[in-house]
Each structure stands twice: as C-alpha cells, then as structure tokens.
Amino acid sequence: EPAPVKPLHMDEETAEGAAASVYYFLDLYRYAYMTGNTTELEAMSENGCKFCRSTIDNATNLHNAGGWNDKWEQEVTNVRYYEKLEGYDYNRVEASVSHQMITSHPGGGVATETSSPTKNELLDFAVRHTNGRWMIGGVRVEQQ
C-alpha cells in the first residue's frame, strides 16, 4: 500500500492548511494500522498527544505480532476550523468521520476481528503551527 500523499498547502499557516493536516493525519492513522509504518504519524504528533501515542503503539504492536488491518473506506466531512482563543496554544479543528467495517488480523494465530461501521463520529483536534507545519497536540472523540 503506498503512503498517503501530503495534500497541497498542508503546511501553510491557514485554516485550509490546518484542515488538510487533519485529513492527512486520518489517512496516516489508517495507513499505520494497515502497514505498521508510523514514521509520518509520529512526525506530526506532539509528544503530549495521548491519542497519537496510543495509535502509534497499537499499530506497532499489531504489526510486531504479525498482524495488520485491511484497508477500510473512510469519509471525512464537515471539517471546521476555529481560531485559537486568547490564552490558548492550539487551534481547534472539528471533523465528522464515517468508516466502513474494519477487519483486523491480530496475528499469532488469533482469529480475525471486525469492528462495526461508524457514521459521523465527531473528532475534535487540537492543532498548532510549529516550525513550518501543523502538529497534532490532541484528539478527542466527542460522545454523541
């Protein structure tokens, strides 16, 4: 599976750049579980991002055990950028994510697992522009 392509203007310090970074992060998230390659995901994740660290660790552990996830279809909609509030270090980007069923092959002789599709799951990203690129400082799944 080829690595996701970086969107044009992704590194610009604009609302469009921040939104493009979120799209790219979500593509890298899927790519990490499919291939075990977390290099680009790590490069755009701040150290304090628990969601990012968990994703990197889980994808790495899955692949170290000989497992992988099949590619799944995902749709990202309603991406909204919010200017950072005075006194805060991060801008906010909100996105609705829907995905088809995910099939995981854990490896080590463990049976294949599937997860249910989701529809319009709301994700809240804390992003900031640092050293010429957008970094992900945190991701929260909103309870609906």
Could you say what each language-model-derived stretch is?
Residues 83-144:
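Exposed beta-sheet edge and beta->alpha loop/turn motif
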Residues 14, 35-39, 55, 60, ...:
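Residue-identity detector for threonine
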